[in-house]
């Protein structure tokens, strides 16, 4: 199943880039745990379920950024876990620039994301991009 999980996650990034939040949310388990570390005006905490992710994460991104890009680079298959290393970039509505790498950790079960964790590479760059 892990190769299928990698394909699922790869497709989710493509859908996110096309602003198709509904398609991304459909890949989440009904009780998904979505973990964001926070900083600046970024989402912070654990969001449970797709509706909480939509309102607490995706809507916050849209409200804060004119440009927001999540560019996956490397996909690492770890069985029921998929780790993605990539790069965030963008410009928030206050003019601050977001520019840092990331590691995203997806735990999968039955083809759905059951847990996600966002780990920006540079906390100060993450906070700076979300401030202003």
Question: PLM ranges: what are they?
Answer:
Residues 9-12, 23-25, 32, 49, ...:
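Hydrophobic pocket/interface hotspot
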Residues 1-30, 130-132:
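Short, low-complexity N-terminal intrinsically disordered segments enriched in polar/charged residues
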